[in-house]
Amino acid sequence: MSDASKRSLNPTLMMNNNNTLPKPLEESLDLKEFIALFKTFFAKERGSIALENDLKQAFTYLNEVDAIGLPAPKSVKESDLIVVKLTKLGTLHLDEIYEIVKRLRYIVVLQNAFKPFTHLKFHERLNAIILPPFFNDLILLLDDEGQIKQGANATLDALNESLNRLKKESTKIIHHYAHSKELAPYLVDTQSHLKHGYECLLLKSGFSSAIKGVVLERSANGYFYLLPESAQKIAQKIAQIGNEIDCCIVEMCQTLSRSLQKHLLFLKFLFKEFDFLDSLQARLNFAKAYNLEFVMPSFTQKKMILENFSHPILKEPKPLNLKFEKSMLAVTGVNAGGKTMLLKSLLSAAFLSKHLIPMKINAHHSTIPYFREIHAIINDPQNSANNISTFAGRMKQFSALLSKENMLLGVDEIELGTDADEASSLYKTLLEKLLKQNNQIVITTHHKRLSVLMAENKEVELLAALYDEEKERPTYTFLKGVIGKSYAFETALRYGVPPFLIEKAKAFYGEDKEKLNVLIENSSTLERELKQKNEHLENALKEQEDLKNAWLLEMEKQKEIFHHKKLELEKSYQQALNILKSEVASKDTSSMHKEIHKASEILNKHKTDQEIPQIITSFQINEKARYKNESVLVIQILDKGYYLVETELGMRLKAHGSWLKQIQKPPKNKFKPPKTIVPKPKEASLRLDLRGQRSEEALDLLDAFLNDALLGGFEEVLICHGKGSGILEKFVKEFLKNHPKVVSFSDAPINLGGSGVKIVKL
């Protein structure tokens, strides 16, 4: 036997091979217990939870049935064996026929319940199920316990009557012996015991002198189960009649099975319809039992909006409110801050919506797209037996998904298992390919480089998990548009790592990287402030919109008034013209020409062009002006309408005349800047992108950017000029060398753009 064959027979290796199989999606998303709980609401045990029907149609049925109510079906068994037996011309047992009857009765109950609601789509579906006459008779054949009703078969009725009579005689005999004085010393109790289908007595040893019979069994205490000789003959008759009853039932089952074979196609249809109705009932009962809501997946919307969604695995969840409006969501930020649970929540909501399973969510304000496939790369695929490393396993999973379209993919800790810089470049390429194939992706990562690279793509959203530095714990909230800090040192301290080791680690970490983290924190702070300002602006914008609507209404009103006035003037003009014509008819021609000439002169006198004078603001040297809410002094007049101005702090700026506002006449004495605190300008930013600009435009933008950065109090900024031919980089270097406020500048680290970006210290 070869080594390969031996390995294949090794049970340990076989178990390891099974472990390499991907986990079911519901297990990866922590939905296993939730789905198991949901399955308990079905009338029939089933593996699949999918709805084998049109989702839109099923959603309509759910709403209609929820408003009226649906009676729950009895529990039923699997129907596959019934179909197989009938297909092979076999005979069904009575309990299998009863499984058919239970389904038929449920259909009939539904049809009767929805008879008054003819306007419903669900009524149309039920009405389409027309039972053949044979099945109406079959429903009446069995009782609620699945036994043949009395009167259905005369022979069977006679046998049952005989059986009942004999059982009564047997009971009477046992009762007589149980209360007999001769047998009292040997009786353990006076009850009738049932063993092997026979009623018998429980006796002590030595009974043979008092009674004769057959010992059926001994008890654990050494007593004897005895069938008296007089009851033995009756027991034989009972057994004989029981056999005759079984034969009669078998004959009836054979007859019924032959009839059912003729309706095999209808039975397949019946089983399928019952399973669908059972699925609806299970979903409704599950939703009512746990106060859950349904979300119909959208086949047109691409964006995902979740409001007050709670993952089922969480006992005290903080409801998730999130808008995922682009093709990819990159989640960064603090360790143990809820990034993985956010990823699982997004995929879980899509999975549950796809199968119309109710969830804890505000359905009216939520939108979930329909995805053909949902995949999760969450667990570590490492397997030593199959020589698969973590990174190799991840690549194997990715390679299987590269051809997929219209799927939702979730990847947790995407950088797992290899070098960070190489992984960033590799995953950027893989993710961009998947995005081009109309897929939506959610990733969690601590790679700042990967986040920066992907942020350049317009279809990528950034989301950061936030950390409360005062309380020293995650807030389990998220901020859009920023790259979050991991807070690895703080997390390690929170989970018991000694502080002196944390300080030592920070020293190894380096000052430059710590500054980068400070920049990231400042960026997050500015983003939060900007978010608050945006809310105020939205309110102000709404007020302006209301004013605009009121103004438009007033304009329409004034237009209507103007139109009425115009009609009145035209009417007056026509009347005057008619009077003039009648007057002219009575006068001579020369007098008429004089009047017309005179009127023409009067009209020309009032004919003037109303030109709006253009106000051109110009400034003189030593004249005060206002620049972006700052008081400045004009020092020098430059070309193309530019001025060199000096702020109250003594900084000199280059500004266009259109940016300046005249406030008062300049003082005669030289302007002395007082020591005041100047607020940061709203336009201040940490980064300037000059790529694609002409040299002259780029230098103007750079000058204004540095001015704003100085006013904002920034000590370090980033200027992106790109690599390209190097012309723009040359101009930028020359400008920075000659700028009086630039302390130094250097190329940025590789993860921030390398030689295509300059870090400028002010």
Swiss-Prot record:
Organism: Helicobacter pylori (strain J99 / ATCC 700824) (Campylobacter pylori J99)
Single GO BP term: mismatch repair
UniProt similarity note: Belongs to the DNA mismatch repair MutS family. MutS2 subfamily.
Complex formation: Homodimer. Binds to stalled ribosomes, contacting rRNA.
Annotated ATP binding sites: G333, V334, N335, A336, G337, G338, K339, T340
Gene3D superfamilies assigned to the protein according to its UniProt record, in alphabetical order: 3.30.1370.110, P-loop containing nucleotide triphosphate hydrolases
GO MF terms, alphabetically ordered: ATP binding; ATP hydrolysis activity; ATP-dependent DNA damage sensor activity; endonuclease activity; mismatched DNA binding; ribosomal large subunit binding; rRNA binding
Xref: InterPro entries: DNA_mismatch_repair_MutS_C, DNA_mismatch_repair_MutS_core, DNA_mismatch_repair_MutS_sf, MutS, MutS2, P-loop_NTPase, Smr_dom, Smr_dom_sf
Keywords: ATP-binding, DNA-binding, Endonuclease, Hydrolase, Nuclease, Nucleotide-binding, RNA-binding, rRNA-binding
The protein's role, per its UniProt record: Endonuclease that is involved in the suppression of homologous recombination and thus may have a key role in the control of bacterial genetic diversity.
Domain (Smr): residue spans on this chain: 688-762
Name of the protein: Endonuclease MutS2
UniProt EC number: 3.1.-.-, 3.6.4.-
Pfam families, per database record: MutS_V, Smr
